A protein has these predicted regions:
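N-terminal hydrophobic/helix-forming segments and targeting peptides
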Residues: 1-185
């Protein structure tokens, strides 16, 4: 597997704060393939120890986090849309984006956020602003709350951005999972 393919595989795993199991499983598989025996802490962290062949070698730790921004469903409105609370938060990445809603039963449901594009506000006297969390509407195209419930959607389900890793002219900007990439590539 080429380096870019490894980076792409890891960065496209959807995992928000408190729901990093899919990344942890990937790392476990990769670490075992590299000959390490992964261990886990009580908070969901994963680590390995590599013993040096050199006596009295310095100890080095590479630490990384596995999560990314996301949301948790706090309510389902009568019209079938959702309101959320943040799990990590960057308001600039929300409006008009695609997300995946993960139900407690394991279903993955595509959802989008609504937003009014700034160019439609020109001439209205309204200045575009960063949305408040309470104003963000997540829509899975359900007719109503009952239909959303039929699909297994409930309070406490998580919503994570759906992203694609691309190789741009100058390379992808990596922040959240850079340390994690270093540990397994």
């Amino acid at each position: 597997m080429e380096l870019f393919d490894k980076v792409k595989a890891l960065t496209e795993i959807q995992a928000t704060s408190g729901f990093e199991g899919s990344v942890r499983d990937y790392l476990k598989t990769r670490m075992i393939a590299l000959g390490y025996q992964p261990e886990f802490d009580g908070l969901g962290g994963i680590f390995v120890t590599k013993t040096s062949k050199v006596a009295n070698a310095p100890r080095i730790m590479i630490a990384a986090h596995m999560d990314e921004v996301g949301f948790m469903v706090s309510s389902i409105k009568a019209d079938g849309t959702f309101r959320v609370v943040p799990l990590g938060w960057n308001p600039l990445v929300v409006s008009g984006q695609r997300f995946t809603l993960f139900t407690r039963t394991g279903k993955k449901i595509p959802v989008v956020t609504g937003g009014l594009p700034p160019h439609l506000l020109r001439g209205t006297g309204v200045t575009p602003q960063i949305p408040a969390i309470s104003d963000i509407v997540f829509d899975g195209a359900f007719e109503n709350a009952a239909e959303a419930a039929e699909f297994g959607i409930a309070q406490g389900d998580v919503i994570i951005p759906e992203t694609e890793t691309i190789l741009s002219a100058n390379g992808k900007i990596l922040f959240l999972k850079l340390g994690t990439i270093v540990t397994v590539v």
